[in-house]
Amino acid sequence: MGIEPNILENKKRHIEICLNKNDVKGGCNFLKFIKLKHNALSDFNFSEINIKEEIFGYNISMPVFISSMTGGSKEGNDFNKSLVRIANYLKIPIGLGSFKLLFKYPEYIRDFTLKRYAHNIPLFANVGAVQIVEFGISKIAEMIKRLEVDAIIVHLNAGQELMKVDGDRNFKGIRESIAKLSDFLSVPLIVKETGFGISPKDVKELFSLGASYVDLAGSGGTNWILVEGMKSNNLNIASCFSDWGIPSVFTLLSIDDSLKANIFASGGYETGMDIAKGIALGARLIGVAAVVLRAFYDSGEDAVFGLFSDYEHILKMSMFLSGSKSLLEFRNNKYFLSSYLLDELGVFKQFYGT
């Protein structure tokens, strides 16, 4: 039995819509209001700079990962397979698209079982928090085991679902399900938003529920309410939420430093300088997604390799010019904030009680 045509068409449309950045970018990521400190007396060899990280039992080449995007359609599966191979060569982690459809179409599991292409890197499976409630802890855990991944991402995407005509409406029980799943798993649990951010209070709660890592996935990147609004030709509603959400910058600047080793940041990180700023703010890893999708569909695998080569050089340059040999040094007060961001941050902290 093949996958229903409407499901395949929806996934294909997601890719098509996300290729046009200007149509689906939501809000401001506030990264432009952060400046990295300049040190004119960096007294060491550029080759001494080390941007490698050890995480999930692997040594990765830089503190960047490819965030989950799509899967299920032929286009999405081919895209994922290519990206996993690229990520393995580059030695960076990668997340796969949601495996929700495998509960209805288990015969397609090989399209999601890509560890055979990812021997050198952490590979993440991905499913919605609502699906844990829907299918139960044991089925989710068994699927994760079959997919042979190094960690599981549980995504929170209420905004997207509420905008979909046939999306989920009942989110009751997701907290309890996340907590129970964390107890049941033999791999780390990553909980992420999908472009609307996570408040400092919710970050603490997710860790208390058993999350190993939290990906802030803030506003300022792809806005999935706009994506669904475009897909259903209903921008009258979707456009009202064009600037909805919390930029990851605000949460990074508001949480305790002790939590940051387990914090990933994504949502509008597109350039090497964006990545450098996110790392300087303390994020363990920075996630990139749509910018990779666009590079791949514009110019193929070579463009993706070029993108990550630029990321590596810009991050190393930023570290050298701020007098940092290591990521640890780079995360040690190597930035300053504009007066505008300081004012906005003050309002944010007051509003969210941090």
From Swiss-Prot:
What is the native source organism of this protein?
Borreliella burgdorferi (strain ATCC 35210 / DSM 4680 / CIP 102532 / B31) (Borrelia burgdorferi)
What quaternary structure, including any partners, is listed in this protein's UniProt entry?
Answer: Homooctamer. Dimer of tetramers.
Q: Which cofactor does it need?
A: FMN; NADPH; Mg(2+)
Q: Where in the cell is it found?
A: Cytoplasm
Q: Gene behind this chain?
A: fni
Which residues are FMN-binding? Answer: S67, S68, M69, T70, S98, N126, K192, T222, A289, A290
Which InterPro entries does its entry note?
A: Aldolase_TIM (IPR013785), FMN-dep_DH (IPR000262), IPdP_isomerase (IPR011179)
Q: GO cellular-component terms in the record?
A: cytoplasm
Write down the Gene3D superfamilies for this protein, in alphabetical order: Aldolase class I
Please give the catalytic activity noted in the UniProt record.
isopentenyl diphosphate = dimethylallyl diphosphate
The UniProt annotation places Mg(2+) binding at E161
Q: Which UniProt keywords apply?
A: Cytoplasm, Flavoprotein, FMN, Isomerase, Isoprene biosynthesis, Magnesium, Metal-binding, NADP
> How is this protein named in the record?
Isopentenyl-diphosphate delta-isomerase
Q: What is its main location?
A: cytoplasm
| Listed GO biological process terms | isoprenoid biosynthetic process
Residues binding substrate: K11, K12, S98, F99, K100, Q160
One GO MF annotation is: magnesium ion binding
- Which residues are listed as membrane-spanning? none
Enzyme class per UniProt: isomerase
What phylogenetic lineage does the species belong to?
Bacteria, Pseudomonadati, Spirochaetota, Spirochaetia, Spirochaetales
Family assignment from sequence similarity? Belongs to the IPP isomerase type 2 family.
**Per its database record, what is this protein's job?**
Involved in the biosynthesis of isoprenoids. Catalyzes the 1,3-allylic rearrangement of the homoallylic substrate isopentenyl (IPP) to its allylic isomer, dimethylallyl diphosphate (DMAPP).
